From Swiss-Prot:
Protein name: Protein IAL1
Miscellaneous note of the record: Might be partially redundant with the LBD6/AS2/IG1 gene.
Pfam family, one: LOB
Residue span, LOB domain: 32-133
Free-text tissue specificity from the UniProt record: Expressed in leaves, leaf primordia, immature ears, immature tassels, whole ovules, silk and husk leaves.
Main subcellular location: nucleus
Organism in which the protein naturally occurs: Zea mays (Maize)
Superkingdom in the source lineage: Eukaryota
Length: 269
């Protein structure tokens, strides 16, 4: 019962009796019993273990759990686990019960097997893709490390740009030209060396070791003279012999090769 008490300010305060409080306590916090108590047709107590996990707006959740596992087994399980783990446990029981109703033989095990098979297939595909990628990366690294640089790259570029045989002929031509140039230089050096030895032979003295003839290397000039008047005859013969050694016939007069030089008569004329 409820009684009213008049306050000093004139307002009325209603006070509920103990019987009314007990009646309100039998109803859940939302004003209606939970899905478990409603399905079991019992009074929902304030400490009902099903009320937090089986709300009245989803009655089929408890119906499936009760059908597969039983309300007594669910109550026993909830009393054995920690209160913080009860929500996950009730959601797991609800999922397993739903899968068992859909597939009475395998239940959730069949779904788990399918998911595991898909996971293994994806792992194999990923490993295969990584293997193919590693092969491409290794080939790219090998080609980059063995790529020709400098003269070798230029030679390969010339060889690829020229027709077949053209590069070989080009190399042979350059080799022949180099040998010809080297041979010409050698021949010229040999001629100069032979001319120098003949000049030394001509400048050798035939009268007491004194030089009586000299051929100038500049402008191809030459000079001729005697060491003394008494030996002119013998010296002329010696010089004539020296010119014969060079393969040059004795002219009637020998002239100086330098510009503006005086003419010197031969000893024999």
């Amino acid at each position: 019962m409820a009684s009213s008490v008049r306050a000093p300010s004139g307002s009325v305060i209603a006070v509920a009796s103990s019987s009314s409080s007990a009646a309100l306590a039998g109803v859940c916090g939302t004003g209606s019993p939970c899905a478990a108590c409603k399905f079991l047709r019992r009074k929902c107590q304030p400490d009902c273990v099903f009320a937090p996990y089986f709300p009245p707006d989803n009655p089929q959740k408890f119906v499936r759990v009760h059908r597969v596992f039983g309300a007594s087994n669910v109550t026993k399980l909830m009393n054995e686990i920690h209160p913080l783990q009860r929500e996950d446990a009730m959601n797991s029981l609800a999922y397993e019960a739903d899968m068992r109703i859909r597939d009475p033989v395998y239940g959730c095990v069949g779904v788990i097997s399918i998911l595991q098979h898909n996971l293994r297939q994806l792992q194999q595909d990923l490993a295969r893709a990584k293997y193919e990628l590693s092969k491409y990366q290794a080939a790219a690294a090998a080609s980059a490390s063995t790529a020709p640089t400098g003269p070798q790259a230029m030679a390969e570029f010339i060889g690829s740009a020229m027709p077949n045989g053209a590069a070989h002929n080009f190399i042979n031509l350059g080799h022949s030209a180099a040998l010809g140039s080297l041979g010409g230089s050698t021949a010229m050096f040999g001629q100069q060396e032979q001319f120098g030895s003949n000049a030394q032979m001509l400048s050798r003295s035939y009268d007491g070791g004194e030089p009586i003839a000299r051929i100038g290397m500049n402008n191809g000039g030459y000079e001729f003279g005697y060491s003394s008047a008494t030996t002119m005859g013998g010296s002329a013969g010696a010089v004539s012999g020296g010119l014969g050694t060079l393969g040059i016939s004795s002219p009637p007069f020998l002239k100086s090769g330098t510009a503006g030089g005086d003419e010197k008569p031969s000893g024999g004329y």
